[in-house]
């Protein structure tokens, strides 16, 4: 049995997919797409090593200890070159995680022809009339190249060392004078590029699990600046001490959302030792945090917030706070509730030394079936 390693490319920005969630994090059941695709291929062969390129290594490592992860580059070629640094097997199979339904039959065709050339690649024939600049092409000579592809590792490394931009491994190998062998591709191995492609593939739908997160934050009064809660000015001078603008509600809510998604906490994302966050707009930081949560496949169900303050009174500001949160997070206002309470003059809150906020949120997987 030939020694083969597997590289799965999962560091793309999903620009053409045109949704808030990166396509590699779409959920198929409970698995993100990148994991589902990798499990599928890894079930076909005892690979020496499996390497996944990533734009979020810390988060992806939470799903499995069976693979190695490496930060991707700005392009496919850069990501592949970095991943190849971890590969020492004679052959390497490379696939895009967006080709999620590669079959065992296609996989076997690649393996069976391993000794035929320097790169073995699946290809589809073109059935439709094809024009280039309004001139008909000979469709018999056209091939639609797919992945996975198997290459001789040393030759692929040498090809990528040219620092040219190749869109797949076969063109890189061919540029080095290497021999390419084509096997029959398949419709199910078409790349998931646009959101409309989801309707063409028979994929498992997202799980209906709900993920709950809580966030708690406390700040002391003492800054002669506006007191802000959810970006709403509550008082012109009763500001809270903080590295940022002191919006304790926004901080609490940010922590709750990050926690529900398993993405750490606000201190990791926006450390108070970083001067670029000095006096930062906390509602803008909240939006950025939620964008990260959406990128990895989640969306908000509802938000419930309890503000604890002896003073000032917040009754007249709750509606404005709810509206501002809804606008910032692009969420229906009926899904947001803001409550206010005192501590009956007990503790530091009762002594009017500061205030605290407890936020709770529920997330669900992004439902791509609605697209």
UniProtKB/Swiss-Prot annotation:
Quote the record's binding site residues for a divalent metal cation: 217, 219, 251
Q: Name one Pfam family in it.
A: IspD
Catalytic activity, EC: 2.7.7.60, 4.6.1.12
In its UniProt record, a GO molecular function of this protein is: metal ion binding
Q: In which pathway does it act?
A: Isoprenoid biosynthesis; isopentenyl diphosphate biosynthesis via DXP pathway; isopentenyl diphosphate from 1-deoxy-D-xylulose 5-phosphate: step 2/6; Isoprenoid biosynthesis; isopentenyl diphosphate biosynthesis via DXP pathway; isopentenyl diphosphate from 1-deoxy-D-xylulose 5-phosphate: step 4/6
UniProt binding sites for 4-CDP-2-C-methyl-D-erythritol 2-phosphate: 217-219, 243-244, 265-267, 270-274, 341-344, 348, 351
Cofactor(s) annotated in UniProt: a divalent metal cation
Return the annotated site residues (Positions MEP for the nucleophilic attack): 139, 191
Q: Name one GO biological process term.
A: terpenoid biosynthetic process
Give the span(s) annotated as 2-C-methyl-D-erythritol 4-phosphate cytidylyltransferase. Answer: 1-210
Q: What does this protein do?
A: Bifunctional enzyme that catalyzes the formation of 4-diphosphocytidyl-2-C-methyl-D-erythritol from CTP and 2-C-methyl-D-erythritol 4-phosphate (MEP) (IspD), and catalyzes the conversion of 4-diphosphocytidyl-2-C-methyl-D-erythritol 2-phosphate (CDP-ME2P) to 2-C-methyl-D-erythritol 2,4-cyclodiphosphate (ME-CPP) with a corresponding release of cytidine 5-monophosphate (CMP) (IspF).
What family does the database annotate? In the N-terminal section; belongs to the IspD/TarI cytidylyltransferase family. IspD subfamily. In the C-terminal section; belongs to the IspF family.
Sorted alphabetically, which PANTHER family does this protein's record hold? 2-C-METHYL-D-ERYTHRITOL 2,4-CYCLODIPHOSPHATE SYNTHASE, CHLOROPLASTIC (PTHR43181:SF1)
Per its record, how is this protein called by name? Bifunctional enzyme IspD/IspF
Q: Which organism is it from?
A: Campylobacter jejuni subsp. jejuni serotype O:6 (strain 81116 / NCTC 11828)
């Amino acid at each position: 049995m030939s020694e083969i390693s597997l590289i799965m490319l999962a560091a793309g920005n999903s620009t053409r997919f045109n949704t808030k969630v990166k396509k590699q994090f779409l959920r198929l059941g409970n698995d993100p797409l990148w994991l589902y695709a990798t499990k599928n291929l890894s079930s076909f062969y005892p690979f020496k090593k499996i390497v996944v390129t990533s734009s979020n290594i810390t988060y992806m490592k939470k799903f499995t200890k069976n693979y190695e992860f490496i930060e991707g580059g700005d392009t496919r070629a850069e990501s592949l070159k970095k991943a190849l640094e971890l590969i020492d097997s004679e052959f390497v199979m490379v696939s895009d995680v967006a080709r999620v339904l590669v079959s065992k039959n296609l996989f076997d065709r690649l393996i069976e022809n391993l000794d035929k050339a320097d790169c073995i690649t699946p290809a589809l024939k073109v059935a439709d009339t094809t024009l280039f600049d309004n001139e008909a092409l000979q469709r018999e000579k056209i091939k639609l190249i797919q992945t996975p592809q198997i290459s001789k590792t040393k030759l692929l490394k040498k090809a990528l060392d040219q620092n040219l931009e190749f869109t797949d491994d076969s063109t890189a190998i061919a540029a080095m004078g290497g021999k390419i062998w084509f096997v029959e591709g398949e419709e199910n191995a078409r790349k998931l590029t646009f959101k409309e492609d989801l309707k063409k593939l028979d994929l498992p739908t997202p799980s209906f699990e709900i993920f709950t997160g809580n966030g708690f934050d406390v700040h002391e009064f003492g800054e002669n600046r506006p007191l802000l809660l959810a970006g709403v000015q509550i008082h012109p001078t009763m500001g809270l001490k903080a590295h940022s603008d002191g919006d304790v509600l926004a901080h609490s809510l940010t922590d709750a959302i990050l926690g529900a998604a398993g993405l750490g906490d606000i201190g990791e994302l926006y450390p108070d030792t970083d001067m670029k966050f000095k006096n930062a707009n906390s509602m803008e930081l909240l939006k950025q945090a939620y964008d990260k949560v959406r990128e990895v496949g989640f969306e908000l169900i509802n938000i419930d917030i309890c503000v604890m303050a002896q003073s000032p009174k917040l009754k007249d500001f709750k509606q404005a706070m709810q509206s501002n949160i809804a606008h910032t997070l692009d969420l229906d206002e009926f899904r947001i509730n803001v409550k206010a309470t005192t501590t009956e003059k007990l503790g530091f809150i009762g002594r009017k030394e500061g205030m605290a906020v407890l936020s709770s949120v529920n997330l669900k997987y992004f439902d791509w079936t609605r697209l």
